[in-house]
Amino acid sequence: VMTGGADVMPGIHATLGRMRRFTEAVQSGAWTGQSGKPIKTVVNIGIGGSDLGPRFVAGALSGFHHPALRVRFVSNVDGADLWSALQECDPETTLFLVASKTFTTAETMANARSARAWLVDALGTEDAVQRHFAALSTNIAAAGEFGIATDNVFPFSDWVGGRFSVWSAI
């Protein structure tokens, strides 16, 4: 597939490979939170195409879900949405996926900052962000400024439109 005269497939395949390895590590328990406990809950924080596509896919494939993992979705800027999701979460075993093309979407970033504060408050260290947050974004630098390790950022191209983002790292 060519875009702007460049073959984009090598980059897409590299990201898909990294996503597979990360997913397998979470599912197997090899990826752990700050305290060394395996992840049990994954919370997707996004809005629009960064929420609807993943939510649809999770629902459609729910019969094939990993039995040790729960998935929650937070998209409403009303704090009650995040609060409701966090009631079922243990900070030591929760992984947040911040899904934002630009990593500046107001609603998504408000929820991400609140989730980050909840996590850091509970675990007592900013270092926990690197083990409990991943980003799906075109803006690797902003995700890094948020505290997300570069290896935990799964990029996609800025030409991917929101309604089509389900076919990307989102």
Label every PLM stretch briefly:
Residues 24-29, 36-170:
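Glycine-rich phosphate-binding loops that contact phosphosugars or nucleotide phosphates
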Residues 1-34:
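Extended, charge-enriched "interface" segments that sit outside catalytic cores
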